[in-house]
Amino acid sequence: MEELRGYLELDRSWQRDFLYTLILQEYIYSLAHDHGFNRTIFLENAGYEKKYSFLIVKRLITRMYQQNHLILSANDSNQNEFWGQKKNLYYQVISEGFAFIVEIPFSLQLLFSLEGKEIVKSRNLRSIHSIFPFLEDKFSHLNYVLDILIPHPVHLEILVQTIRYWTKDASSLHLLRFFLYEYRNWNSRISIKQYISFFSNRNQRLFLFLYNSHVCEYESIFIFLRNQPSHLRSTFSGAFLERIHFYEKMEHLVKVFTKNFQVILWFFKDTFMHYVRYQGKSFVASKGTSLLMIKWKYYLVNFWQCYFSVWSQPRRIYINQLSNHSLDFMGFLSSVRLNPSVVRIQMFEKSFIIDNAINTFDTLVPNIPMIGSFAKEKFCNIFGHPISKPVWADLSDSDIIDRFGRICRSLSHYYSGSSRKKSLYRIKYILRISCARTLARKHKSTVRTFLKRLGSEFLEEFFMEEEKVLSLILPRDSYTSQRFYRGRIWYLDIFCIHDLANHE
């Protein structure tokens, strides 16, 4: 009982005071600059990062609130455009620092939770590829999957309320509201979905923090119910409700949960339920029946709408059978298929042949989306035929080969866990021929001439570094080497989806 309360109850000691004062510290902006996701603002304003000082930071905040200097002549459109960009610069700088500051309570809580526990603090745990071995082990035994588009909050105040759980500094919350509503005011005619897209492009770090903190709020309850089915019947619902105490629908929640709590607990009895989230999607896979998945679908819709004021619709959740459906997951097409095998058993003078089928989790390179990405970047046409890259034709030969080679090696590294290498070889072929066509275009020659001139050295640029290492360690004709070349290898140093593999 105490363990459950410790999980659900609000730990007020982690609420941070006076985060707002850190905004006036110039070192915060240096740290935000070093770890920020988007550095284009500093690259476009050369030398700006060297001018940070206490006075400049205060001046930026002052100008954010002073709108009079932006009221210029309506006829002078160029001047208005200049001041609009400058105002955007002020918001960009301050919001990056603010995003770094509000992450502090979460970082401190994570470090505290690791103290006294034998948990390896490895960067490899951050790799997005670490999820695939888990999927290979679990999903091959499951039947159905819910393909969920995570809904966006219907109001900006919901994001502010989520941060209220972690800090009681009112000034910081007011500043957060100011950022959100100022971005909203600039684009008052756009929808909430368009606004979120606009805001995420302008300030990725702050948006990712707000989005993840909001999603983690309902995930903490969702996953808790999934992991603790045997203890919930003896748990008072008040402890469960305390987790989301700051929502205004407290009285309604108490009535609903007191009345229907036993029904909800029965709903979470499936011990074969697995949950995976990435970007704006999530998967809930189960070994249950289609009827159970339909109940899950409508429960999630009501869960978001009633308890978290998040608008969702049943059509945003798709029920699919794993054996007949492929998941578009982090640039891979993942599916569960039957892998037939024949076993011959010899018993004395008689022999038996047994047909056996085992479910395997396949991860494939999606051909059509990849060709679409390559066509968009001008490596091939929409049919997959390699073409030259005119933008790179002015570079030196070594730079052209190096750029194509790095793209090829990075894609090979990313798709090293693919079940079938044929599609990966197709990608290498497109890049290799596109490189040759670009060089031929530069020197006004033919592709065949360049392939003859460069020979094997040209092909080596498109090998993975891992393949070179394996070829040095293991003989090409050895059984172990062949298994490495044909098998799946998941590398734990990949922290984001490859740009060409991101088909969202």
Curated annotation (Swiss-Prot):
This is Maturase K. The gene is matK. It comes from Nepenthes gracilis (Slender pitcher plant). It holds the Pfam family Intron_maturas2. PANTHER family: MATURASE K (PTHR34811:SF1). Usually encoded in the trnK tRNA gene intron. Probably assists in splicing its own and other chloroplast group II introns. It comes from the Eukaryota. GO terms for biological process: mRNA processing; RNA splicing; tRNA processing. Keywords: Chloroplast, mRNA processing, Plastid, RNA-binding, tRNA processing. Belongs to the intron maturase 2 family. MatK subfamily. One of its GO terms (cellular component) is chloroplast. The lineage of its organism: Eukaryota, Viridiplantae, Streptophyta, Embryophyta, Tracheophyta. GO terms for molecular function: RNA binding. It is found in: Plastid, Chloroplast.
